[in-house]
Amino acid sequence: MSTNHLLEIKQYGQSIWMDNLTRDIIQSGELKDMVENQGISGITSNPAIFEKAIAGNAIYDADIEAGVRAGLPIYKIYESLVFADIRNACDILRPVYEASNRLDGYVSIEVPPTIAHDTEATISEARRYFQEIGRENLMIKIPGTEPGLPAVEQVIAEGMNVNITLLFSVESYVNTAWAYVRGLEKRLAEGKDISRIASVASFFLSRIDSNIDAKIDAKLKKGVDDIAVEAKLKAVKGKVAIANAKLAYQEYKKIIRSERWQELVAKGATVQRLLWASTSTKDPNYNDVMYIEELVGPDTVNTVPPATIKACADHCNVSDRLETDVNNAYTLIENLKDPDINIDLDTVMDELLVEGIDKFIQPFQSLMNSLEDKIKVLSPV
C-alpha cells in the first residue's frame, strides 16, 4: 500500500485542512473518511466554494423548494443551505476537535464579503452566524482589512473562534496577531475564560507569485539587453510567496516569545497559528505541491484544495523546511527593490487584498443570481 504523505506532515506539527465543502462529500461519507483516515483535520470555505457547490447541483433543490414554500427571501435560503452544510461538517469534525484538545476540528465560514470594510456589520454578522450555526468548533472568517481588525478583536473578546483571511503582507499578519492578543486581553480583563478560543491567520501564497510573475514576464517580454538583469528577474519568479511566508513565520516566533503573549499563555491562551492559504500552484511549470512542501513546520496549518490534497498524498516530499533558507528569503524580498527588478511589494499586497475581496464578492453575487433562477424554476406556478 502506498504512503499517504499527508499523514507524514502531522509529525512535523502542521495540520492539514481542506479548502472545500459540498453537500455531496458530506452525504456520501467522503468527508468522514478523509477526516478519519486521510489526515484532514479542518475545513475552510468561502463564497466561491459555495457558489460552485450550490449553483449547479440538484442535491440542494429540495431545501430550496422548502425555503420557497416558507416564503424565505433569497439570502435566507442561501444561509439555510450553507448553515446546514457547516453544521454537518462541524459534527463530522467534532471528534478531532475533542481529541486534539481544541487545536483542530474547525470549520470556517466567511461573513458576507460585501461587508469587508464595515466593522460593526462584521461584528454583528459574526455574532449571528456563531449563534445560529450553534457549534463550538465553528470558526468565523473575517477579512484582514483595516476595518476588519477591530472586528477581530471584539469577536475574540466575545469568545468566538476566528479565521482572519486575505492576509498577503507580513505587516498585515503582524497586525492580525496583535488584534488577537488584544481581544484575549480584553476578555481576560472581563474575568472570562480564554482557554477555549482558537484563531488562525490565513496567509495567502499562490496569488502573490501569480501577480509578481506577471509583472516580471511583462518586463522580460519588453526585452532586456543585459543578461545579468534578465537573470535577476528570472531568479525572483515563483519564489516571492514562499519567502514572504517564511518571514511571516519569523514574526510569529517573535510574537509568541513576547512577554505580553507569555502572560496570556499562563492564563490558558491558545496560540494563533499561521495558516497557509491559496496553496494550489497556478503555474503548470511549477511543482504542483511546492506551497505545501516548502512550508511544513510546527504550529502551522495548510488548507489545501481537493486536487492538491490528492497530489500531496501521492508525491509530497515531506520535511521540516519552514525555517530553512530564511536568510535567503530576506535577501530575495529585499532584492525586489533593486532598480533592475523594481517591484513594490507593498503595492502588490494592496492590489491583492482589493482583488481578493472582489474574488469573493463576484461568486457571492453570482450565487444569489443562480439561486434566484433556481427559485423561478422550482417555485409552484
From Swiss-Prot:
Pathway noted in the entry: Carbohydrate degradation; pentose phosphate pathway; D-glyceraldehyde 3-phosphate and beta-D-fructose 6-phosphate from D-ribose 5-phosphate and D-xylulose 5-phosphate (non-oxidative stage): step 2/3
GO cellular component, one term: cytoplasm
EC class name: transferase
Keyword Manganese annotated: no
InterPro entries linked to this entry: Aldolase_TIM (IPR013785), TAL/FSA (IPR001585), Transaldolase_2 (IPR004732), Transaldolase_AS (IPR018225)
Molecular functions (GO terms): transaldolase activity
Gene Ontology biological-process annotations: carbohydrate metabolic process; pentose-phosphate shunt
Residue numbers annotated as active site: 141 (schiff-base intermediate with substrate)
Record EC number: 2.2.1.2
UniProt KW keywords: Cytoplasm, Pentose shunt, Schiff base, Transferase
One Pfam family per UniProt: TAL_FSA
Reaction catalyzed: D-sedoheptulose 7-phosphate + D-glyceraldehyde 3-phosphate = D-erythrose 4-phosphate + beta-D-fructose 6-phosphate
Location of this chain's protein in the cell: Cytoplasm
Functional description taken from the UniProt entry: Transaldolase is important for the balance of metabolites in the pentose-phosphate pathway.
Listed PANTHER family: TRANSALDOLASE (PTHR10683:SF31)
Family: Belongs to the transaldolase family. Type 2 subfamily.
Name of the protein described by the UniProt record: Transaldolase 2
Organism expressing this protein natively: Nostoc punctiforme (strain ATCC 29133 / PCC 73102)
Lineage of origin: Bacteria, Bacillati, Cyanobacteriota, Cyanophyceae, Nostocales
